[in-house]
Amino acid sequence: MDIIAAIEDRSSAARLTEPAPNKEQLEKILRAAAHAPDHGRLSPWRFAVMEGPSRGILADAMADLLLRNHAHASAEMLVAEKSKALRAPMIIAVAAHVTAGHKVPEIEQVVAVGAAIQNMLLAAESLGFGSMWKTGAPAYDAGVRQALGFAADDQIIGFVYLGRQLAPGKPREHTLTGLVRYL
């Protein structure tokens, strides 16, 4: 596989369907994550894999969050919020488990988790799956974090949605104009 082409061709897939990665494919995706650069070898990533009915845990937690923030949310709003957790056959919540006070600064530990997620996206692509890295209010909510079984001081960095892409994504053109300074 040409890694540059894979990086340039990969795009987020908004519409994903069955099948989800099987056990062997999931293992490859998670192993790719664990191969991310990790100063201090702290393995600061934690994963919560949701497939099939277990996505309902996330759906319920998202609905609870909506109700806490909008006590008068309509039934339609709750259904719409829950449906966000059903947009892919598999969702992996990825959290940073930071070792506070370690010689490796916290920011480096969190960035390592971001690199792990990028590895997951590229591994999924190489296995023929579409993917999307999502965040939003649920990623920053203690109730969602608790519902997914993460430690109180873990921070969800993203939700990786995985499945078969219904329509080809549109890779973006990226320019370096104004972003690079040569010294």
Language model regions located:
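Short, electropositive alpha-helical surface patch
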Residues: 144-155
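Small-aliphatic-rich amphipathic alpha-helix that forms the alpha element of a beta-alpha
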Residues: 33, 92, 98, 102-146
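C-terminal helix-cap and adjacent tail motif
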Residues: 3-6, 12, 156-183
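Ordered, amphipathic secondary-structure segments that act as subunit-interaction surfaces
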Residues: 79-101
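N-terminal amphipathic, basic helical "cap/leader" segment at the start of enzyme domains
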Residues: 1-87, 183
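Short loop segments at secondary-structure junctions
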Residues: 52-54, 97-98, 164-167
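Structural motif
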Residues: 89-91, 130, 155-157
